[in-house]
Amino acid sequence: MTIIRKKHPLIKIINHSFIDLPTPSNISSWWNFGSLLGLCLIIQILTGLFLAMHYTSDTSTAFSSVTHICRDVNYGWLIRYMHANGASMFFICLFLHVGRGMYYGSYNMIETWNMGIVLLFAVMATAFMGYVLPWGQMSFWGATVITNLLSAIPYIGTTLVEWIWGGFSVDKATLTRFFAFHFILPFIITALVFVHLLFLHETGSNNPTGLNSDADKIPFHPYYTIKDFLGVLILLMGLMILVLFFPDVLGDPDNYTPANPLNTPAHIKPEWYFLFAYAILRSIPNKLGGVLALILSILILALLPLLHTSKQRGLTFRPITQTMYWILVADLLILTWIGGQPVEYPFIIIGQMASIAYFAIIVILMPMAGMIENNILNLD
């Protein structure tokens, strides 16, 4: 068996990636989220495949086809809610994975980090298009509002929006193409995941100390396969509690009303995992400025390697930057809350303050804290 594992052209790739992979001996549970994201992707592809067997991407039948899945298909309700809540679990794992990378300085592995940012954009695009497919009120108006943002692009904006819509409004053509893209993107994401892993295995994993761990490596299997399996059990338990007891807690009641272009919902808002970016978008009165801020809210992650000023890699031994980091986390929670609130006083000003704080902490305060800590270390 050992000979096959190490010699077979196909199996040896798996062997070098998941079995004999030299791994730092001290990586904590924060390193579990990579494998959990892989699990989420598999769950989403499988449940999505079975949903696609019964779904029809036509404006006249899309809403009723989802109802049909829930009522008439064997365990259709389970597949549908696993897919919807699986997306939420996916984003929880994504945010924790990115947060771990920021805390421990994993962004210094630049190729892996940039590939991760591309993956984040791809997953966000997929989730957005998936939200349009049930063709409820929030699906329709969410699609209208978000695609309309592209009209802020000078000169070509309006033409671009109509090209994406396939007409003069969000309609049948839009729904059909969104379904096509929503189906293909997870497979593109899977390919990108392998590239992400390829870059990661070039450098090896980071660890909580931020130090070189070449002198202290252990094989991935059985140590981290067992550890990852525990994470898998916890994730699946959390997902099934959500699906079986609170399936609609993260959804919007408006999406149980069929799409109606003549009736605008009181508060148009995306799923909870986009609310922080939506709050940043809304906090700028200018349309183009809002769109740029929205894109920058994610793209700013690519600047982290350039903004790293500390002599140490992670935040483990850096209390000042640690404080800034946790203020940033609190700020993101505030933005998420604001994104779900109506556009009125005092939410507008809170959103604007939180948006300024978000960019200021990342671009100014954290690099400054790193330099202050360097100076403290130099004091005799």
Curated annotation (Swiss-Prot):
Assembly and interaction partners: The cytochrome bc1 complex contains 11 subunits: 3 respiratory subunits (MT-CYB, CYC1 and UQCRFS1), 2 core proteins (UQCRC1 and UQCRC2) and 6 low-molecular weight proteins (UQCRH/QCR6, UQCRB/QCR7, UQCRQ/QCR8, UQCR10/QCR9, UQCR11/QCR10 and a cleavage product of UQCRFS1). This cytochrome bc1 complex then forms a dimer.
Note: Heme 1 (or BL or b562) is low-potential and absorbs at about 562 nm, and heme 2 (or BH or b566) is high-potential and absorbs at about 566 nm.
Transmembrane region(s): 33-53, 77-98, 113-133, 178-198, 226-246, 288-308, 320-340, 347-367
Subcellular location per the Swiss-Prot or TrEMBL entry: Mitochondrion inner membrane
Official protein name in the record: Cytochrome b
Source organism of the structure: Clethrionomys californicus (Western red-backed vole)
Residues that coordinate or bind heme b b562: H83, H182
Domain of life according to the entry: Eukaryota
Predominant subcellular localization, coarse grouping: mitochondrion
